[in-house]
Amino acid sequence: MKKKCKIGDKIPKFKIPLSDGNLLDSKDIKDKKYILYFYPKDNTPGCTTEAKDFTNKIKEFKKLNTQVIGISKDSLETHNKFINKQGLKILLASDESGKVLEKFGVWVEKNMYGRKYMGIQRATFLINEESKIEYIWEKVKVKGHVEDVINKIKSS
């Protein structure tokens, strides 16, 4: 088990594909704030709500010079179907191998109805202009989350 990222840590090194055809390279995460939000699965109720909430506030994030990127294990094909079906205005990154999830400490053992399995813990990371983790929301509850993120960016 990898150690979890902490506030103040430099982000781990990684490269994963983005829904717009580009590559998300950790070395390029600088010079503005980034929201990297990790979510379990495209086209599921909580994940759809979270993606739409980020989309609905995208203009506000742009005013705050902040790039929003959602990350899950879904394929780029699934991401693009999700984006088109839901009218999303955010980028999604595909981590099919789960290596980035592990580096950020969000690939965890879960327990549902007594059954243990590995899955993504919904979490959001605020990354500052120096590529350091400024804030972490763990075990995110979707309702009101995007407003919390915006308020944190405004106060930082």
Specify the residue positions occupied by each region the protein language model found.
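Chalcogenol-based redox active-site neighborhoods
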Residues: M1-S156
